[in-house]
Swiss-Prot record:
Protein name: Inositol 2-dehydrogenase
Keyword list, A-Z: NAD, Oxidoreductase
Species annotation: Klebsiella pneumoniae subsp. pneumoniae (strain ATCC 700721 / MGH 78578)
GO BP of this protein: inositol catabolic process
Catalytic reaction(s) noted: myo-inositol + NAD(+) = scyllo-inosose + NADH + H(+)
Record-linked PANTHER family: INOSITOL 2-DEHYDROGENASE (PTHR43593:SF1), PTHR43593
E.C. number: 1.1.1.18
One of the Pfam families matching this protein, by short name: GFO_IDH_MocA_C
């Protein structure tokens, strides 16, 4: 039986998820769509194969009798509101990152979900579903390079618009590393420090770019993440793990190597959707399967909360040259099942 999905938010990622659920994945049908811009919603339901009703409001989607589960892909500041409403309605909800705009907002979602008595929330962190990250985690978990001592990572975007500000390098960009590195290392952050090198000429007045974000984990691993969102040359994700007995690197995306015109070259992707397109597919298929099976297993509301606690510390660290403590409470037993 097909799982009936309601999608709140039909912008870039929402429209892509509607296409994905309709044309690529199995076991789900999009039956309801809303967006603050009605043209976005109408464009989404006009995609080949989509047969969904357009609603004026996200709450109407949540309360629709024919909707079994919710995808929240709306404007970031609305995520908490719609996720809480889905929990109150007893409907499983896949919420794109960030789960909420603050750690306090994420904690409200955690508390509401625990009060509901079962996991209803999956956060849209797709990197744990990426083949490269899964392979890298297996190397670490199997002890092939010994205990992880240091990580060197980079999150580079070709360019961003003038509405992108210094704090968004944390809340919209680094947020993925904040989640996936906890998962990769099975560890939490102890402290964070942010440094600003010489700024690129391709940035604007409200954005300091690049940034170097340095963490110490509770097990003592040191992590440096370069966030450079106007790198010009492409979309580039790097992760190198230095262990006691060896070094492991995140594999590069598969690409044809060319020898031409006295040069040796390999193309670099420019679109984040292309870099993790398979991971997005696997992530949403897992959500669909888990909802139908009655038990969610993907990134939880607690994972969203943990990433937000770290993000808040990073933003605080942007305003000082000193390390800032990352204070994450003990994970409740509810999320350790």
């Amino acid at each position: 039986m097909s799982l009936k999905l309601g999608v709140i938010g039909a912008g870039a990622i929402g429209k892509e998820h509607i296409r994905r659920c309709t044309q690529v994945l199995q076991g789900a049908t999009v039956v309801a769509v809303s967006d603050i811009n009605a043209d976005n919603a109408r464009a989404a339901v006009a995609l080949p194969g989509v047969q969904a009703e357009v609603y004026a409001d996200g709450h109407d989607v949540i309360n629709a009798s024919d909707v079994d589960a919710i995808l929240v892909t709306s404007w970031d500041p609305t995520h908490e509101e719609y996720t809480l409403a889905a929990i109150a309605a007893g409907k499983p909800v896949f919420c794109e990152k960030p789960l909420a705009m603050t750690a306090e907002g994420c904690r409200r979602i955690v508390d509401a979900e625990m009060k509901a008595g079962r996991r209803l929330v999956q956060v849209g962190f797709m990197r744990p579903y990426d083949e490269g990250y899964l392979a890298l985690k297996k190397v670490i978990d199997d002890g092939d390079i010994g205990a992880p001592l240091m990580l060197r990572c980079a999150h580079r975007n070709q360019s961003v618009g003038e509405n992108y500000t210094t704090d968004m390098a944390i809340t919209n960009t680094l947020i993925h590393e904040l989640d996936v590195l906890r998962w990769l290392l099975n560890d939490d952050y102890r402290s964070v420090q942010v440094r600003f090198p010489r700024s690129t000429s391709h940035t604007h007045a409200r954005l300091k770019d690049p940034q170097i974000v340095s963490f110490e984990t509770k097990k003592g691993t040191l992590i440096d993440v370069e966030v450079f969102v106007n790198c010009q040359y492409g979309y580039d994700i790097q992760c190198e793990v230095v262990g006691e007995t060896g070094i492991a690197r995140l594999p590069e995306p598969s690409a044809v190597q060319m020898r031409k015109s006295a040069s040796l070259s390999t193309a670099i992707l420019t679109d984040w959707k292309d870099r993790f397109i398979k991971a997005y597919d696997v992530e949403l298929q897992a959500f669909i399967n888990d909802v139908k099976a009655g038990q969610l297993h993907g990134p939880s509301a607690w994972d969203g909360y943990a990433a937000s606690v770290a993000a808040d510390a990073c933003i605080k660290a942007q305003g000082t040259s000193e390390p800032v403590e990352v204070t994450l409470p003990e994970c409740p037993a509810f999320y350790k099942r």
